[in-house]
C-alpha cells in the first residue's frame, strides 16, 4: 500500500504540471510485493514463535495477508485517481500498463500476475458513485498485453486473459496489445523489437535508442506532445482527386511540424526548476 500511495501522489503531481496523459506500468510496483512478503513473514514468525505451526501453514497465512495488502494497494490507486483533482480541475489522465513480459525474473512475474489479477477484478467491480451505485470509472485506463504465456488454454497465465475478457465485456476495459505484432512493428535501430505502453491514452512513441547508453528508452522519455492529422478531412477536402489528396496531406504535415516547433520554442529558456518533478526527477527528463 505505501508504494501504491506514493505512486498516486506522483501521478497527481505530474498531472498538475502538464496537460497531457501519462502512463505507468504495474511492473514497477511488482518488486514491492516481495518486500511486503518478507515483512509479513517476519511478523508471522514472531507471532507464531513457540507454537506448533507448520512451515506450510505459515506460508498460507503470509500469502493470505499479502493478498489483502495488494487488494488495499490497488484500491488506493483506483479510488485516489478517481477522487483526486489536479490543479487544472481534472482527474489525472492515467494509463496503467499490464505486461508480464516486463518482469525481470520468475518471482517478479508471479507477483506481477497477482497485481494484474487484483487490478482487473477491482475494475470489473467498478467504483461506487455518490448514490452508491457501482459505475465504470473513466480512469485509470487499462492496457493488457497478449503474449505467449497467456493466450492459449493451459498457459500459466491464461486465467488472467479470461478475467480481462470478462472485464472488457462489462466495463470496456482493458484495451489489448499484441506483443507479437509490437515486436514486429516497433523495431529500433539496433534491429530489436519492443513492446511498450502508449503515452497517455493513445499515442505510441517511435522506437528510440539513447545515444548515451545504446539502449532503448520509453519510460521517462521527454516528449513534447502529439499533433494529429484528420485523414478523413483531408480525403473529403480532396474531392476524390488523389493528386490533390497528397498535396493537402503534405500541407497538413508541414502545419503539424510548425505546431510542434511552436511548443518547442515556447519552452526554450525555461529553467528546469520551474517544474522539478517533470524536468529533474524523471517524469519527462532528468535535467540539471
Where are these regions (language model features)?
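Conserved catalytic cores of very large enzyme subunits
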Residues: 1-288
